[in-house]
Amino acid sequence: MVEVRRLLEYNEKIRHRYFEAMAKLSWEEFIMNREASFHSLRNIFIHTLGAADYWLDFLQKADCHSKKKFDEYKNFDEVKAYMETVDVRTRNYLDSLPAGGLGKKYTLKNDADETIEITAEDILIHVFEEEVHHRGEIIALLWQMGVEPPLMGWKDL
């Protein structure tokens, strides 16, 4: 069975590949409204970072996530800096977990306003799948632009 830590390491590696591919586009192409979930490639990419950042705050009982709006990211360097911040936060959180820490339980309200009990691992799997879903969207947008997306297979399959 694959441990959630490996999934998050995979996501980080692939996230960097996709960022590097998108950074080859012009800034105008990156921020163009493409009528997708969060409109532009920039916004979709930042949304996935923001989701991870938000849930890390939840898990750490912190308020460290970026408060910047999509349009406040004005160049690739700013997006890359945010990506690297989320990478470090994720690694630091995982490294700080005690034995059994992934099993820590939380009670919260979901988007359907239902009270649910979940574990830290459940939250991290949600973070993983949120990024994977939006990566599919980014892939489709790149294809529409005539850009071949980077390889993303698990274990480089």
Predicted ranges, named:
Residues 6-17, 81-85, 89:
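A non-catalytic, amphipathic alpha-helix used as a structural packing/dimerization or gating element
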Residues 1-5:
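Basic/polar N-terminal segments that are highly enriched at the extreme N-terminus
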Residues 62-100:
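Helix-adjacent hinge/juxtasegments
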Residues 96-111:
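Acidic catalytic patch
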Residues 8-20, 24-69, 111-157:
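Short, contiguous alpha-helical
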